[in-house]
Each structure stands twice: as structure tokens, then as C-alpha cells.
Regions:
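N-terminal lobe/hinge region of extracytoplasmic solute-binding protein
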Residues: 44-94, 125, 195
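Ligand-site clamp/hinge motif
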Residues: 188, 218-265, 280, 384, ...
Length: 543
């Protein structure tokens, strides 16, 4: 199950506009204080480190440190838009195949060496190594890269691919310090003593914590040239609950990745804010339309299912309401969201009316609707994780109320991915999906993706949607691309091969002693550090 711009739950999310960000606590950046340099910020994190190399980073700690220490040619800003980072500028030619990046002249590694095109070539070469199978494996597949000068690099794609800019957010590695191939990368001392280009650098690592110190020549903070905090300490805990206990005792300043059940406890802590950061992680019910015998072959049945499910209640059961109801492939805060598409408001009465009108009625009076001798029943396959299982049971209850019999088939997550999803061994599949910051629905709805390793779990495709999805991938202009997406969203909303249910939030608790944190959507947990160079603990009186 792969996709060019995603990680698997499947993993890599549509672009989010910040104007609608929902937070339990608001930004604290507007308080009447001015930031001052100094101070140590301590955050509790679940897990322990294996490698800080961004290509090898696997644990929560690895990924957090990697985000603080390294940077890429581009990055996502607060609103989810791709902007230049290590690059000063970038452009794409009219064909959509040739992308050219100019590296900013003031970008340096922590050892003072300049960032050059050689670093880009080296990093891309590692990601293109056949032995590498990590989350960035698809980012540069089939892409050729060349250095036009020490500061200019050019990527040539086999075909136009509008979301390619998102691939260039991949953190760069220093070619002057690492000359080994991918197979030897894991044995390098560099992995726990990395040299990067980010606002902080690793100072010390022990069994209890990793300490990072400020880089005094960080290009993105110029003209002040450095972050406000002196140090960031990431302290290791067994799990999120233990880290939350440390926050309650005042041992750390923040912790994240909290469960909805933790939210109530956070509210009892004095001087602590709870932030609910939107993500593009959505949960959906894919309806398998492949079999000619499937009840899902009838579009009215699919529309009735979408109408009968109380998404708000499903969200409450699965995530204590921490998130938002989903209506389409991207959230309402995305540039790709289209308001003018068919939506299915929860209504048991309307769902019953749809089924009655299509002659799906209880002819044999056994409590289950049927038509032509076929009972309206199916099984939902999902993971045995409590939140997902709770969602499945709530859906089953909603559908039972309109005369549809639903069984819940819960299996371990590994089995769900490797056997059930990949082999398409299900009637309906309830899963969580993460898509790239620049949305690409192609892997989920194109005819070429109906079998593994594609992600078209429903088996849905039409000639029209195929052409639209192909054209959207080739269209760099965002406005034109949105128009193409609008047609795709309308087709999916009408045909209902999948019922979008809800988006989840990332819960982050932080002491009010820290200032400068700004609420933003997070594509992944480390993205909470998106403006860490502006965080501060010390203040001076405003003049």
C-alpha cells in the first residue's frame, strides 16, 4: 500500500488554511511581553532514541530531534503552504517536469560548511537506493537530479507531478561528512551526533534525555541569527501517560500525543494549556464494490449508509469529540476543499426512505432488509484498537436502526494491513488514512490502484474520474487543480465508494511559562516545532 506523497496507516495531507484552526487554547504570542534570549525548555516524550538521522529516524524521539536539527530545501508554513527553506527560490517549467532550486547563500551546516548542491545529490541518492524502504522511498522514484552549480540543483521528473514540491521538504544530509551508501548509514556515529542545518544541534545524549543547544547562525532567524531558547531538552518516558504525570509534577514544560481521555486531566493542571491541533488524519469506511454480488453495487445502498451514520457520534465515541466531522477527502481548512458538493446529513428517516424507494425492504420480516432474495448485510473489517473498534460498533448500531445488518470483524493492526487490506479481503474496511500536505487522491480512486500496492480499497473507478485525477497530477496551477478536484469530489460524493467519517486532532499540553508557540495544523507530531526558533521563556519589559 504505497502512495507517492504519503505514509501508511497507511501512511505521508491536504494543505490547511490557518484561518479555521480550532484550538482549546489560543496563541500566547500576543501577550504584552517582548522575548529575550535564554532559558531551557524541557518536553516529555514517549520512547527513546535509535537514530537522529532523518532517513533512519523511527521513534518519536528520533523524529522530534530530526525536525529540530535538520531542514530541507522547502518546508510547510503555518497555513500548510510550501515555502522555500534551505532554498532561496524554486520554480517549475511549463511542462511540470523540470524543477529548479537555488540554495540560499547564507545556509550553513552546524560545523560552518556551506550547504551545496552536492548535499542534495547525496541525500536523493540515498533515498533512491533500492535497499531504502522508509517513508521517503517514493519521494524521488524515477526522478533524475543534477547540480547546475554549487548553489543550483535541477530535478527532472518522468512525468508532470504537481505535488512534487512536497518531496523537497525531505531533510538534507551533509555530503562532506557522510560519504557512505545506505547500507552503511546505520553504523555511523553521525546517527547520535548529527550535524544539521536547523535551529538546534545535539549537545548530549544519555539514557534519560537528549539535550539540544541553540545554533547561533541559523539562516531563518536572520537578522537576529539565532533562536531565543538556549536549550531544548527532550526527556524520555515509557509512554504518554507517564510523560503527562511528569508535566503534572512540574518536571517538564510540555508533552504531546495525548489521548482524549487525558484531556480532562490536563484541564485540572494549573498554568497548563491544552492545544488541539488539527491534522489531516481521517477515518473512513471503504465499501468494496468489486463483486457483482455485493450489496454495495447499488449506489442507493451506499448513499443510504452515508445518510444513516451519525458522524458526530462516531467521533465522540472514537476520540471524545477531539477532531472534526469529515465530508470529503480533504478537511474544510484545505485549499482543495470544495463546499459545493453533495453532503449526507445524518437522518435515520431519510436513509430509510432511500432504501424503501429502491425496494430494499424487509420482505421476509426477519428484521433485515432484502431485495431479490439478497439480504442487506455486510461485515466491517477494522483493527482491534479500542477507538477504531468503538467507531465500528457505533456505525453498526446506526445501520441496524435502518434495517441493515452489520457484523464487526476486528483483527490486529498488522493483519488488517498485510492480509485484509492488501488482499482486499473485506466487505467494508474501516481504517485511518494520512495523505500528503499537497493532496493527491489518485492512489485511492484511480483504476490503476484497485489492486495492491494501490490504495483504491473500494475498487472504485470511472473513465471520467481517471482522466480528472491524471490531469490534476499534471496541473501545477493551484486554482486549476482545485477545479479538477471539485469534479472528483462531486463524483465521489455522488457515488459514495467511501464514507468519510472524521478527522482527528493532535493533543498537546504546554506550560504557560513558554511563550511564542503558535497554533498550526500538524501533518505529523514533530511539526508542532514549526516555529520553535520563536519560542521563548524569558522576557524584557516592552519599551
Amino acid at each position: 500500500m504505497t502512495g507517492r506523497d504519503k505514509l501508511i496507516v497507511l501512511a505521508l495531507v491536504g494543505i490547511l488554511a490557518i484561518t479555521s484552526v480550532v484550538a482549546i487554547a489560543s496563541d500566547r504570542s500576543d501577550l504584552p511581553t517582548d522575548p529575550a534570549f535564554g532559558g531551557t525548555y524541557v518536553e516529555g516524550v514517549a520512547g527513546s532514541p535509535l537514530s537522529f538521522d532523518p532517513i533512519l529516524a523511527a521513534t518519536n524521539v528520533d523524529q522530534d530531534v530530526s525536525r529540530l536539527v535538520f531542514s530541507g530545501l522547502t518546508r510547510f508554513d503555518r497555513g500548510g503552504t510550501i515555502v522555500a527553506d534551505l532554498a532561496s527560490t524554486f520554480e517549475v517549467d511549463p511542462s511540470g517536469r523540470i524543477w529548479t532550486f537555488t540554495i540560499r547563500p547564507d545556509a550553513t551546516w552546524h560545523d560552518g560548511a556551506p550547504v551545496t548542491a552536492d548535499d542534495v545529490l547525496y541525500t536523493v541518492g540515498l533515498l533512491q537506493d533500492k535497499a531504502y524502504r522508509g517513508p521517503f522511498a517514493d519521494a524521488f522514484r524515477g526522478v533524475s537530479v543534477a547540480a547546475l552549480s554549487p548553489q543550483i540543483v535541477r530535478f527532472t521528473l518522468p512525468d508532470a507531478y504537481a505535488p512534487f514540491a512536497g518531496s523537497t521538504t525531505v531533510p538534507l544530509l551533509p555530503s562532506h561528512l557522510l560519504s557512505v551508501g545506505f547500507n552503511d548509514l546505520a553504523r555511523q556515529p553521525f546517527n547520535l551526533r548529527p550535524i544539521g542545518t536547523g535551529p538546534f544541534k545535539v549537545s548530549d545524549v544519555d539514557s534519560r534525555q537528549v539535550t539540544l543547544v541553540r545554533s547561533d547562525d541559523f539562516y531563518r532567524t536572520k537578522p537576529r541569527s539565532r533562536a531565543y531558547l538556549d536549550k531544548i531538552v527532550l526527556r524520555f518516558y515509557r509512554d504518554e501517560a507517564e510523560a503527562l504525570g511528569a508535566l503534572a509534577r512540574g518536571e517538564v514544560d510540555a508533552t504531546g500525543g495525548l489521548s482524549p481521555q487525558d484531556a480532562g486531566r490536563v484541564r485540572t493542571l494549573k498554568g497548563v494549556d491544552l492545544f488541539s491541533l488539527p491534522t489531516n488524519d481521517f477515518t473512513a469506511l471503504f465499501l468494496n464494490v468489486r463483486s457483482t454480488k455485493s450489496v454495495f453495487r447499488d449506489r442507493v445502498v451506499r448513499q443510504a449508509i452515508a445518510t444513516a451514520i451519525d458522524r458526530g457520534k462516531v467521533l465522540q465515541v472514537a476520540a471524545d469529540g477531539r477532531g472534526s466531522v469529515a465530508d470529503e477527502f480533504v478537511p474544510s481548512t484545505s485549499w482543495a476543499f470544495v463546499r459545493d458538493v453533495p453532503r449526507y446529513a445524518f437522518s435515520t428517516a431519510d436513509a430509510r426512505a432511500l432504501l424503501d424507494g429502491a425496494d430494499w425492504v424487509d420482505h421476509d420480516f426477519d428484521g433485515v432488509r432484502d431485495k431479490g432474495g439478497v439480504a442487506l448485510k455486510f461485515a466491517i473489517a477494522t483493527s482491534d484498537e479500542p477507538a477504531r473498534l468503538g467507531a465500528a460498533r457505533q456505525i453498526a448500531d446506526d445501520l441496524t436502526a435502518v434495517g441493515i445488518r452489520v457484523d464487526v470483524r476486528a483483527v490486529p493492526f498488522a493483519d488488517l494491513v498485510d492480509r485484509v487490506a492488501r488482499q482486499r479481503d473485506f466487505d467494508a474496511l474501516l481504517v485511518g488514512i494520512t495523505v500528503g500536505n499537497d493532496p493527491d487522491p489518485y492512489p485511492f480512486f484511480h483504476s490503476s490502484q484497485v489492486n495492491d500496492p494501490g490504495d483504491d480499497f473500494s475498487g472504485y473507478s470511472t473513465l471520467i474520474t481517471d482522466r480528472l485525477l491524471e490531469q490534476a497530477r499534471r496541473t501545477v496551477d493551484q486554482g486549476m487543480r482545485r477545479e479538477l478536484f471539485a469534479q472528483v469530489w462531486n463524483a465521489i460524493a455522488t457515488d459514495v465508494p467511501v464514507v468519510f467519517l472524521y478527522y482527528t486532532d493532535y493533543l498537546y499540553a504546554q506550560s504557560r511559562t513558554l511563550q511564542g508557540f503558535r497554533v498550526a495544523p500538524v501533518n505529523d507530531p514533530p511539526q508542532r516545532f514549526w516555529n520553535v526558533e520563536d519560542w521563548y521563556l524569558k522576557t524584557v519589559v516592552r519599551q
